[in-house]
Amino acid sequence: MGSRWVPVGMVTAVLCAGAVGPVAAQGDPSPAALSALKREYRRPAALPVENQTLADLGRDLFFDPKLSASGTTACVGCHLPELGWVVTEPRSRNDSGKLTSRKSQPLIGLGHAGAASVGWDGRSPTLEAQAKASIATGSMSMRETDRPVKVEVIEARIKSDAGYVAKFNKALPNAAITLDTIAQALAAFERTLEPGRAAFDRWIEGDEQAISESAKRGFVLFNGKANCFACHGGWRFTDDRFHDIGVATTDRGRGRDVKDDELMQFAFKTPTLRSVALRPPFMHDGSVPSLYDVMRLYEKGGIDRPSRSPMMLPLTMTEQERLDLVAFLETLTGAIDEARAKQ
């Protein structure tokens, strides 16, 4: 969330319609302007599943510890469905059980991300590449492992399971069971993880009782004075880009791979805010305990350093405004898809 620079674009145009904006400076938007703004957040239809059999196979693999070197760690260990497909630990653990330097990222809505790269630092160009890296390094994509991984051993485990052999033959006829096809199945499943329908969605669709008056004020702040929409606009609440928001860290994020771009140093990918209230602590390293503390971080503008996003400027909010923003973010918690979450 949160930058104070207001880009020229659809949302800004909506806010300014009828002498509305900035919203926080000139009061509540007109009904017409608010209605137009809400349309920008209307969720599209769920993506069609290209190969349901492959996605079902990927779901089985996602919950199976056979994919780890130790045989005890599954993808779900860092991506719990009931917590918005992350865990509540500030940082994830690798296959050896040791803490890494980063928190797991939510997996919801990734099928809508198009060509956007995957991970806090965008190292993986596709979900397939991310799945392969997680298995091959034993690090759950964190680049931090002390357990050697022999991919052929993991492939052999799957090949020796008659159930998996039958499922692979059905999903990918005539294809061998390899790291590539395992990753293909995992990615197919992950693309089916749509954000659950939330109270916010019901409000957007016309149910005025779905969210509180405080949350409605928070939505206006989100798209006005607090300017959170600059990075978190749209129904998925992410721009899929990388920003240094001034979090105290030695982790260079995107800058580890993009060394010649100053703004990419200490920059991390904007996470979706869907079901955000389920997954404290926040930021790439789990260093911010609560949504309220997130508000305070953005008010201060973060650490001043050359890479800090020019959108990060100090902001003064009242206590009620902070509470309204938190109330709004809490309306983004979606229902769990039991069919995909069931082990």
PLM regions: where:
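Bacterial N-terminal signal peptides
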Residues: 8-18
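Periplasmic c-type cytochrome electron-transfer domains
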Residues: 2-7, 21-343
